[in-house]
Amino acid sequence: MEGIAARGVDVRSRAKQYEKLDFLGEGQFATVYKARDKNTDRIVAIKKIKLGHRAEANDGINRTALREIKLLQELSHPNIIGLLDAFGHKSNISLVFDFMETDLEVIIKDTSLVLTPAHIKSYMLMTLQGLEYLHHLWILHRDLKPNNLLLDENGVLKLADFGLAKSFGSPNRIYTHQVVTRWYRSPELLFGARMYGVGVDMWAVGCILAELLLRVPFLPGDSDLDQLTRIFETLGTPTEEQWPGMSSLPDYVAFKSFPGTPLHLIFIAAGDDLLELLQGLFTFNPCARCTASQALRKRYFSNRPAPTPGNLLPRPNCSIEALKEQQNLNLGIKRKRTEGMDQKDIAKKLSF
């Protein structure tokens, strides 16, 4: 981590240390490249943070990037992405990470792959182990979703993209509720809670587990109101007795009393131990929601089948561009194939 702490290093010479090999993807806040470290011959991923908003960077500092660097410098766990280097000037910052072969979103969407109960258990075990480590250090991830769960060539899953991560624990600290991608956002966040804890990450884990089982997003809402409607229609509308304090949340709206569908009728192939875990993750009262440590002690993880070792987990059978083409065809979208297709059209969306 010597490179991260260095000051006054010439940015151009630092950047020349890395040979760009491929464009991996572009998000709202960053562009990601595959590169080779010329000094070590190691394959890495470089996340170039885009210039922040004027208000955020008016003193020449991208605070989101600095927060991500600061947090990642303090973390060391097999299931957390490794920050290898960081360099930049003012609000232009590049972060260098372990290169990861794929992500859980790609695995879920690759219909040529069969995900067995042992595979799913392995993904959940690694996710929860990384999350337990974070929560023990009083850090919330706040943006868990399948494409932020990366997999290396050995099948090791690592939590990534800590741009929204935050330390927690102060009883009087107020947080923003505009975190977590909507489909994985917990009910308390959707109701505008400004004080929350590990429950926001655990609800997201439940949504990811459901997506692994169903192979489609579990609760794909179009707006915050639609998201809450889908949650309550599916899982039932909670009462004040089930979730004390619900009606006092800043953006609370009373909903029709939906009965919901029992989990065993939604996840028809799930055993009692898996249903017990899902029930714990989808508990409406965030104070009673299952924690990462509690989840790892559930009988689901000690019962058979045992989790599949990482090196035996499935890997994408087709190229990313072929996978995207298949998804478009499934949606009835015809795409014209052309020679020399723009790299941006076939680039994999990958966040670090």
UniProtKB/Swiss-Prot annotation:
Phosphorylation at Thr-176 is required for enzymatic activity. Residues 18-301 form the Protein kinase domain. It is found in: Nucleus. The lineage of its organism: Eukaryota, Metazoa, Chordata, Craniata, Vertebrata. The active site is at residue 143. GO terms for molecular function: ATP binding; cyclin-dependent protein serine/threonine kinase activity; protein serine kinase activity; RNA polymerase II CTD heptapeptide repeat kinase activity; RNA polymerase II CTD heptapeptide repeat S5 kinase activity. Keywords: ATP-binding, Cell cycle, Cell division, Kinase, Meiosis, Nucleotide-binding, Nucleus, Phosphoprotein, Serine/threonine-protein kinase, Transferase. The modification Phosphoserine is found at residue 170. Pfam families: Pkinase. One of its GO terms (biological process) is regulation of cell cycle. Probably associates with cyclin-H (ccnh) and mat1 to form a multimeric active enzyme. Belongs to the protein kinase superfamily. CMGC Ser/Thr protein kinase family. CDC2/CDKX subfamily. This is Cyclin-dependent kinase 7. PANTHER family: CELL DIVISION PROTEIN KINASE, CYCLIN-DEPENDENT KINASE 7.
